Amino acid sequence: MAEEIEVEETEDFHDMDFNDEEPSCSGGAVQARTERFVVKKWVAHAMWGWDVAVDNCAICRNHIMNLCIECQADPNANQDECTVAWGECNHAFHYHCIARWLKTRLVCPLDNKEWVYQKYGR
């Protein structure tokens, strides 16, 4: 199946009309390539994606990018101090929440697999 697709693509490629002729000099005049189209306006669009399936910490139920309940209770807490921790299972929690959870259980709260830090930070 993949071979058929490749053959079709190359056939389409060969049917395209190219102007590969090099400009030649004849009598001191240089032939310029004619443009087939001119881009008058280009509007770029971007999308931001989040690779975590859930937006909330399953332990404290707050949005993962907001402060956890521990940091909300501390008036001196800084947004940078409340980081996100990812496990090898790709589940994400607030670092403070998962650290408190791991004091009593050494498994992920969602899938009950052994918890191993993959990364943590913003």
From Swiss-Prot:
Gene Ontology MF terms in the entry: cullin family protein binding; NEDD8 ligase activity; ubiquitin protein ligase activity; zinc ion binding
Main location group: cytoplasm
Protein name: RING-box protein 1B
Naturally occurring in which organism (per UniProt): Drosophila melanogaster (Fruit fly)
Subunit comment: Part of a SCF complex consisting of Skpa (SKP1), Cul1, Roc1B and a F-box protein.
Gene3D superfamilies documented for this protein: Zinc/RING finger domain, C3HC4 (zinc finger)
SUPFAM superfamilies for this protein: RING/U-box (SSF57850)
Record CDD domains: mRING-H2-C3H2C2D_RBX1 (cd16485)
Protein keywords: Cytoplasm, Metal-binding, Nucleus, Ubl conjugation pathway, Zinc, Zinc-finger
Annotated gene: Roc1b
Binding site for Zn(2+) 3: 89, 91, 108, 111
